[in-house]
């Protein structure tokens, strides 16, 4: 099953991506090779091979929750570009109706 440039354009549009004609051709070629490899894997006879959903034998390995000292607050605050009332001040990324965002 080959993939077409139209299919790649469609997926790119859904992903809000845009490609040049050269990039489109490159991605189409790469995706076509990937599909060929998957089709090749589908032909492998796995009869008698046990199903494994997790190859790692460890199950629910937990560690004790231990509090450890963090970085010294004064040392940390020396490295921040801007602070206010003991907190690190960062630029607003959402506008909630207040000035500055």
Swiss-Prot record:
Name of the protein: Aspartyl/glutamyl-tRNA(Asn/Gln) amidotransferase subunit C
Stored InterPro entries: Asp/Glu-ADT_sf_sub_c (IPR036113), GatC (IPR003837)
GO molecular function: asparaginyl-tRNA synthase (glutamine-hydrolyzing) activity; ATP binding; glutaminyl-tRNA synthase (glutamine-hydrolyzing) activity
Homology family: Belongs to the GatC family.
Catalytic activity: L-glutamyl-tRNA(Gln) + L-glutamine + ATP + H2O = L-glutaminyl-tRNA(Gln) + L-glutamate + ADP + phosphate + H(+); L-aspartyl-tRNA(Asn) + L-glutamine + ATP + H2O = L-asparaginyl-tRNA(Asn) + L-glutamate + ADP + phosphate + 2 H(+)
Subunit structure: Heterotrimer of A, B and C subunits.
UniProt gene name: gatC
Pfam families reported in the protein's UniProt record: GatC
Keywords: ATP-binding, Ligase, Nucleotide-binding, Protein biosynthesis
Species annotation: Enterococcus faecalis (strain ATCC 700802 / V583)
């Amino acid at each position: 099953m080959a993939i077409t440039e139209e299919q790649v354009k469609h997926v790119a549009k859904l992903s809000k991506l845009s490609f040049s004609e050269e990039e489109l051709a490159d991605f189409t070629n790469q995706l076509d090779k990937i599909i060929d490899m998957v089709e090749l894997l589908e032909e492998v006879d796995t009869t008698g091979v046990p199903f494994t959903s997790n190859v790692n034998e460890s199950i629910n390995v937990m560690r004790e929750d231990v509090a450890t000292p963090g970085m010294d607050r004064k040392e940390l605050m020396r490295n921040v570009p801007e602070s206010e009332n003991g907190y690190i001040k960062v630029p607003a990324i959402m506008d909630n109706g207040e000035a500055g965002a």
